[in-house]
UniProtKB/Swiss-Prot annotation:
Highly thermostable. [4Fe-4S] cluster binds at C13, C16, C84, C100. Keywords: 4Fe-4S, DNA damage, DNA repair, Hydrolase, Iron, Iron-sulfur, Metal-binding. The gene is paudg. Its EC number is 3.2.2.27. SUPFAM superfamilies: Uracil-DNA glycosylase-like. The 4Fe-4S cluster may have a structural rather than a catalytic role. It comes from the Archaea. One of its GO terms (biological process) is DNA repair. It is an enzyme of class 3 (hydrolase). The lineage of its organism: Archaea, Thermoproteota, Thermoprotei, Thermoproteales, Thermoproteaceae. It catalyses: Hydrolyzes single-stranded DNA or mismatched double-stranded DNA and polynucleotides, releasing free uracil. This is Type-4 uracil-DNA glycosylase. Belongs to the uracil-DNA glycosylase (UDG) superfamily. Type 4 (UDGa) family. Removes uracil bases that are present in DNA as a result of either deamination of cytosine or misincorporation of dUMP instead of dTMP. Can remove uracil from double-stranded DNA containing either a U/G or U/A base pair as well as from single-stranded DNA.
């Protein structure tokens, strides 16, 4: 199956009750020019409206953070574990994650990313479990990368905060940006001002 056919399946999915509340399923978008896939938790209201991932305030923060690293948003594939918006933007439950996980596994199998960046605990837990590992608290795995196989693809899974958490707690912004810099191979050198 190719990505376009998979995304059509996602748009018409009724595997869990979330399909009753959505305006649009949000399969994901972007290219694999850098071999990177970014995986969030679930769409929010803006994403549900647009049918595109990370287009609301959290998406703007992510896009700005990528831009600071010289990374164009369209050069990475961006998606979520859960493809439909949970009511009131609540955290997706286990049933919803399990219903959508086969879609994410298929996306990984088709796109064959070298690196996956998990944003937030729901994404980290789901992807770590696919690698045969566990993640109970984000603090235990945040800022770290793990080697493993998902969908038969050898990947490096790197974990950081979800941008929505950074919006709620702006003190996390620097750490979020540093994690992304490390994950994209830029290290912290990009943030050093040579004039100081």
């Amino acid at each position: 199956m190719d990505l376009q056919k998979l995304h059509e399946l996602i748009k018409n999915c009724d595997k869990c009750p979330l399909h009753k509340y959505r305006k649009n399923a949000v399969p994901g978008e972007g290219e694999m020019k850098l071999g990177v896939m970014i995986v969030g938790e679930a769409p929010g209201a803006s994403e549900d409206e647009a049918g595109r991932p990370f287009v609301g305030a959290a998406g703007q923060l992510l896009t700005e953070a990528l831009s600071r690293l010289g990374v164009r948003r369209g050069d990475v594939f961006i998606t979520n574990v859960v493809k439909c918006r949970p009511p009131n933007n609540r955290t997706p439950n286990r049933e919803e994650v399990e219903a959508c996980l086969p879609y994410l596994i298929q996306q990984i199998g088709i796109l064959k990313p070298r690196r996956i960046i998990a944003l937030g605990l729901i994404s980290a837990k789901a992807l770590m479990e696919l690698m045969g590992r566990r993640a109970e608290k984000l603090g235990d795995v945040k800022g770290k990368c793990y080697q493993g196989r998902i969908a038969g693809v050898q990947v490096e899974l790197c974990i950081t905060y979800h941008p929505a958490a950074v919006l709620r707690k702006p003190a996390l912004r620097g750490e979020f940006q540093k994690d992304l810099a490390m994950f994209f191979g830029g290290g912290l050198d990009r943030f050093l001002d040579p004039s100081k």
